């Protein structure tokens, strides 16, 4: 941890301690900019940015009770609703490519079947400076949206309504470098929805875990005294007693067979994170287009947004969209899973391994998410308070995930002043077969109010290696385990931090989160070992790539463009926080430092640094055309809210 990050102290001549900030004559927590770029008459600092975990619509707690009096828009939008409206006049999806015979419903179909009627009601085509034609058609040789595309005239004869085609061999060449993977088959998903999908490995390992737990409970409670007298000769009672007796006999059999074994140990694909450039799992903003952008800019390992175990088991569409990845993410793509109980962990991991396992390098158990709703349900960082349950979840996942390695992401603890990661890591080494451990150097209670404690992260890394040596001695007569990968996480937003943290040889790599959102080219700096001052036009090109990847993923129809614009604004809520190196007196600017109000070196740079959500909307028009009146975007901070009626 750097001296500036930790607020290091120096001893003055009179023996008193002087903070590093005061020693070098700067204001602690404030970014130092060149005077000519500070906006005159605006001495106040920019509003504090919220770094709390974003909450997906999938995790919003429904509001209950009576309607409360409206309050002034302050603080965070805890229950944001950024769902976009769909077209009023919708063309039948089967006719999007022009095949009138494709719809089985015929005249009873609730969608339009007349293409010309649809085109009369369709929103006007997109006209924007960055894209003159359909970017999806240009990239893949085919536009899946067909007549619904907002760039339709670029791949359709508008007089004959004949869609353009690309030769098959050329399309195959384009597809080989630009397609998405990890799609679950529709019949498999339907089996999950109908609750008829089998989970044989999960059921077996849960039996083993239950048997070991039951034996432990019996030992703690002591043998129950035999009841006096005969069992009542009631058929139902006798049947239940017989079932319990058979179940207990089965549990004793499983306990005898497995309690002294590492039953969860399975042969896995090797997981190599050593000095890899890793992007953290990020809810909402860590979507496929962003991950694809980060791969293009040098990332080696990416993770899905956090997926919830129960909706995965139930075959929910929105949850099964999360494991999807771009082909450029392979190898090195992992799915992060949140759960509260071993049965959830086992069945979700088995479903992932069976349906998309070929496209996964690891399955990661989230034991660090601080979101209140998940914590109250026993998921995320709540598992830190129940290490035994976390271990059961990990062992169940490891047993069912075939050859896909299992990893875990932790925080230092749940409460300030009570770090538990050191002791927990010993149990993880001794009692599980995790392939990797990621430690975020903050507690749940701390959130982002102070810097990450990299001193503690280093202590845990050192202890982990000694625990591995101890385990090797204990299990010397058994097959040796691979070295557990240890990854540190927290506050890394420049190449100097990256290499400073890796000076500890026990730390395999550093995971980057906010640093990658604010400065996506951070891994280019890591490779070059120098700061790169991107111009406004270069940063606009990054946004152009993000917009193109978004349209590849969400589509170019009206609803797809609305989603692209919404997630573009979510990305801008972090991207705008970059303070250009050329306007700074001291660099780098730390994540917890707030700049004064500033102007850029040109108008575009000023626009890219705007904190106003309306400016993010304005910027999106360069890629997605004019913003429709029904577009909805609520940023996380209410003071930045944008509504069509307020221009």
Swiss-Prot record:
Residues 67-77 have a biased composition (Basic residues). GO terms for molecular function: flavin adenine dinucleotide binding; mRNA dihydrouridine synthase activity; tRNA dihydrouridine synthase activity; tRNA-dihydrouridine47 synthase activity; zinc ion binding. It is found in: Cytoplasm; Nucleus. Its EC number is 1.3.1.89, 1.3.1.-. Residues 1-26, 47-89 are annotated as: Disordered. GO terms for biological process: mRNA processing. The active site is at 369 (proton donor). FMN binds at residues 281-283, 336, 409, 440, 489-491, 513-514. It is an enzyme of class 1 (oxidoreductase). The keyword Flavoprotein applies. InterPro entries: Aldolase_TIM, DUS-like_FMN-bd, tRNA_hU_synthase_CS, Znf_CCCH. It holds the Pfam family Dus. The keyword tRNA processing applies. Keywords: Cytoplasm, Flavoprotein, FMN, Metal-binding, mRNA processing, NAD, NADP, Nucleus, Oxidoreductase, Repeat, tRNA processing, Zinc, Zinc-finger. Its cofactor is FMN. Residues 7-26, 55-66, 78-89 have a biased composition (Basic and acidic residues). A zinc finger (C3H1-type) spans 86-116, 122-158. It catalyses: 5,6-dihydrouridine(47) in tRNA + NAD(+) = uridine(47) in tRNA + NADH + H(+); 5,6-dihydrouridine(47) in tRNA + NADP(+) = uridine(47) in tRNA + NADPH + H(+); a 5,6-dihydrouridine in mRNA + NAD(+) = a uridine in mRNA + NADH + H(+); a 5,6-dihydrouridine in mRNA + NADP(+) = a uridine in mRNA + NADPH + H(+). This is tRNA-dihydrouridine(47) synthase [NAD(P)(+)]. The lineage of its organism: Eukaryota, Fungi, Dikarya, Ascomycota, Saccharomycotina. The gene is DUS3.
């Amino acid at each position: 941890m750097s001296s500036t990050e930790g607020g290091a102290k120096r001893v003055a001549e009179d023996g008193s301690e002087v903070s590093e900030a005061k020693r070098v004559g700067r204001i602690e927590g404030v970014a130092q900019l060149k005077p000519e770029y500070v906006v005159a008459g605006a001495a106040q600092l920019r509003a504090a940015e919220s770094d709390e975990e974003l909450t997906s619509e999938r995790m919003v707690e429904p509001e209950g009770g009576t309607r409360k009096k409206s309050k002034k828009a302050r603080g965070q939008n805890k229950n944001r609703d950024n769902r976009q409206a769909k077209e009023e006049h919708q063309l039948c999806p089967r006719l999007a490519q022009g095949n009138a015979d494709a719809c089985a419903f015929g005249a009873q179909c609730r969608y339009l079947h007349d293409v010309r009627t649809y085109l009369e009601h369709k929103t006007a085509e997109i006209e924007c400076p960055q894209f003159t034609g359909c970017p999806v058609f240009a990239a893949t040789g085919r536009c899946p949206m067909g007549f619904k595309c907002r760039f339709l005239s670029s791949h359709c004869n508008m007089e004959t309504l004949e869609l353009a085609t690309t030769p098959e061999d050329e399309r195959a060449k384009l597809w080989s470098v630009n397609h998405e993977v990890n799609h679950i088959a529709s019949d498999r998903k339907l089996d999950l929805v109908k609750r008829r999908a089998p989970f044989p490995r999960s059921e077996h390992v849960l039996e083993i875990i239950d048997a070991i737990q039951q034996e432990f409970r019996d030992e703690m409670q002591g043998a129950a005294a035999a009841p006096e007298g005969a069992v009542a000769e009631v058929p139902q009672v006798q049947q239940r007693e017989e079932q319990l007796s058979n179940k207990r006999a089965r549990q004793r059999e499983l306990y005898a067979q497995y309690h002294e074994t590492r039953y969860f140990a399975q042969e896995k694909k090797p997981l190599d994170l050593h000095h890899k450039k890793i992007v953290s799992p990020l809810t909402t903003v860590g979507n496929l287009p962003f991950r694809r952008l980060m791969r293009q800019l040098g990332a080696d390992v990416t993770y899905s947004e956090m997926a919830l175990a129960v909706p995965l088991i139930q075959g929910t569409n929105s949850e099964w969209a999360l494991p999807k990845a771009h082909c450029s993410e392979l190898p090195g793509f992992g799915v992060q899973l949140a759960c509260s109980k071993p049965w959830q962990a086992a069945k979700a991991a088995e479903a992932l391994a069976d349906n998309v396992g070929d496209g996964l390098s690891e399955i990661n158990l989230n034991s660090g998410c601080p979101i209140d709703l998940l914590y109250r349900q026993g998921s995320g960082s709540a598992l830190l308070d129940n290490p035994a349950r976390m271990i059961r979840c990990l062992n169940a996942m490891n047993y069912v995930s075939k050859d896909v390695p299992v990893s875990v992401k932790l925080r230092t603890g749940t409460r300030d002043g009570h770090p538990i990661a050191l002791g927990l890591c010993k149990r993880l080494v001794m009692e599980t077969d995790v392939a990797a451990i990621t430690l975020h150097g903050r507690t749940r209670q701390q959130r982002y109010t102070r810097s990450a404690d990299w001193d503690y992260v280093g202590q845990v890394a050192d202890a982990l290696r000694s625990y591995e040596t101890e385990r090797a001695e204990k299990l010397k007569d058994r097959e040796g385990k691979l070295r557990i990968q240890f990854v540190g996480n927290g506050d890394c937003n420049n190449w100097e931090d990256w290499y400073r943290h890796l000076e500890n040889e026990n730390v395999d790599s550093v995971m980057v989160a906010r640093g990658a959102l604010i400065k996506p080219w951070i891994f280019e700096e890591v490779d070059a070992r120098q700061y790169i001052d991107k111009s406004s036009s270069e940063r606009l090109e990054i946004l152009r790539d993000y917009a193109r990847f978004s349209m590849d993923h969400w589509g170019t129809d009206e609803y797809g463009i609305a989603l692209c614009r919404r997630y573009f604004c979510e990305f801008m809520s972090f991207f705008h926080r970059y303070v250009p190196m050329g306007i700074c007196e001291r660099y780098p600017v730390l994540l917890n430092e707030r700049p004064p109000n500033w102007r850029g070196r040109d108008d575009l740079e000023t626009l890219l640094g705007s904190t106003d959500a309306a400016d993010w909307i304005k910027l999106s028009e360069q890629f997605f055309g004019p913003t429709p009146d029904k577009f909805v975007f609520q940023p996380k901070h209410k003071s930045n809210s944008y509504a069509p009626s307020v221009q």
